[in-house]
Amino acid sequence: MIQSTQTWRVLAGGLAATAMGVTVFAGGTAAADPSPPAPPPAIPGVLPPASLPPIQSVTAVPGGITTNNRFVATPQAPGPAALGQPPLAVAAPVSESLHDYFKAKNIKLVAQKPHGFKALDITLPVPTRWTQVPDPNVPDAFAVIADRLGNSLYTSNAQLVVYNLVGNFDPKEAITHGFVDTQQLSAWQTTNASKADFDGFPSSIIEGTYRENGMTLNTSRRHVIASSGPDKYLVSLSVTTALSQAVADAPATNAIVNGFRVSSPTVSAPVPPQLGTR
């Protein structure tokens, strides 16, 4: 395992934390799109959904993903040599979750803790009012941050989990299962999804809504399979709010989703493209 003098970094509003060797930085607001299906009333300081970049239209996306998906690249017009060629086959959707896939491959998942963790550099922005909280309801939590001053019965939160993956497998094959655990949530509706690499690593991100305890929740969930030397890690981030708070909380959730980073201490990863702003 590659060792580094760098420690896990958390971005926050100009504060300094010394517990567990956490370094805190000031971070600006980026953008994601955990947005509700219907546009709510305008809120001061938050741009309306009309400011989103044009949504790309695709004709066939596997796995039950919406056909209006701004994560999918614009299809290129076929050149003269491509005309008349048969269309490419669409891969059949997978039914196993990532954890089911790893179990079938006899891959051992070893939960990691932030204290002394040096295999990867992980950046998790902490917006204003959000704080790191202990949460026994999150199995194997690496970090949990939440807005405990919000107005909703549901506390907006972000959960980070990191596992060392012990065993042999193909990360590109594994990440094809990245949507399944989220799609199995009650009354799940997808709004955006992508399996593009993230910081140079195989990754999946899916966003949408689901039902839990009588509430509709809006969530963004990303899996990253990161390498550090010969070792591989599953880094999973979920950012969730009540649907009724999705627009009001957008500056905070956007900052978390777009400011999140994963890199190997010895490899300079490319900066991924920003998601559309609200």
Swiss-Prot record:
Pfam families: Lpp-LpqN
Top-level taxon of the source organism: Bacteria
Signal peptide extent: 1-28
Organism expressing this protein natively: Mycobacterium leprae (strain TN)
Full protein name: Proline-rich 28 kDa antigen homolog
UniProt keyword annotation of Ribosomal protein present: no
Family of this protein: To M.tuberculosis Rv0040c.
InterPro entries: Lipoprotein_LpqN/LpqT-like
Keyword Secreted: no
Alphabetic keyword roster: Signal
